[in-house]
Amino acid sequence: KIRIETKKIRARDLFEKDERNCGLWIDIFIIENTFDNALLRTLQGIGVMGFRYILSCVKFKRNEEALSEVAKPDSPLSKYIRSRCRLGAIFSVIPLSVWTCLSTKWVSLCKNENSRLVSIPGGRLQFFRELYCRDDFCNVERIEFEGRQAKVTCDYKTYFAILYGNNYTKIPPEADREKHIMLELDKKALEEAVRSK
């Protein structure tokens, strides 16, 4: 994935170790080619899942202190964090930058720009549940969004239904909404930025 960040609005989540470089961000997930051959596609997907797990373990270890602060001692979450950090300590023998480079090479193994399927390996549902038909997914149309013209996949209804369920147009009850832990968020700067648009 690609991260677009602004330093004008300070924001820091659990995985932001360097407090000097904290800003509000959006993630843009890369659409990757995947193999038409089912065996090669499966191997690509298993590798993607393995690299995602290793990268997350290394990040857990790097941010162990901040993660430990959000979990009660001896809770299931605390045990989960400790186990991921132990694995992260082992994987950290190789620097995160090297793991990231290897992962990037692996997810982009398929060079066929006309493959039948594409995947979003960095997406929330990961490789196997984010497989899409190229002809449907990679064709785009323009729609109005927030007063601007934006290019979106022609098959956005299928995409949103896969990610959020068939009722994706309805705002879920507060208890069912996705939550993100923020250690720091400059709400005043965020509100000013929104008002100025």
Task: Enumerate the predicted regions with their spans.
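Short, His- and charge-rich active-site/binding loops that engage polyanionic ligands
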Residues: L43-M49
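Conserved catalytic core of two-metal-ion nucleotidyltransferases
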Residues: K1-D36, Q44, S56-Y164, T169-K197
